[in-house]
Amino acid sequence: MCIRDSITDDIDRGYGHVLCTHTGLVVAYGAVVFDGEPAYAEIDGTWLDQAPYVVLHRLAVAQEVKGQGIATEFMRRTMTLARERGTGSFRIDTNFDNRCMLRLLAKFGFVRCGEIHYAGDPRIAFQKIL
């Protein structure tokens, strides 16, 4: 599935979230999923717990605002939304070479739990207890 189809599917399922400036300019997008992630059922490693969790996929920040804390704010808002819904855990995966995401996850104290396969590709799996 191409990224455009993935985003359309996210929106259809109610997963698509955007972060906007005060003027309404969309500066970030992510799929915030509370239904679980089938790819997380098998992990080469161990999750921190087995409680319900939120997942974030496809976090993207507009090029013109990179380096301005937009991804950090999106993560904060995702965690707030999870807490408001009574979800105490946040799982996420990323490519091994995604340095920006790896730094962001370290900043928020995510724990590396192992490796999963998402869409056929190996990914590093992380979790944070909220």
Question: Which ranges hold each PLM region?
Answer:
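Conserved small/polar residues in nucleotide/adenosyl-binding loops
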Residues: M1-D5
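Short loop/turn motifs at secondary-structure junctions and domain boundaries
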Residues: T8-D12
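Conserved beta-hairpin
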Residues: R13-G30
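Conserved acyl-donor/pantetheine-binding loop and adjacent beta-alpha core of acyl/acetyltransferases
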Residues: A31-R58, K66
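Conserved catalytic-core motifs of GNAT/GCN5-like acyltransferases
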Residues: F34, D93-T94, A106-A125
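Conserved acetyl-CoA-binding loop-helix of GNAT-fold acetyltransferases
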Residues: R58-V61, G67-T80, R103-K107
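Conserved active-site alpha-helix within GNAT-family acetyltransferase domains
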Residues: T72, E84, F96-G114
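Conserved GNAT acetyl-CoA-binding A-motif
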Residues: M75, A82-N95
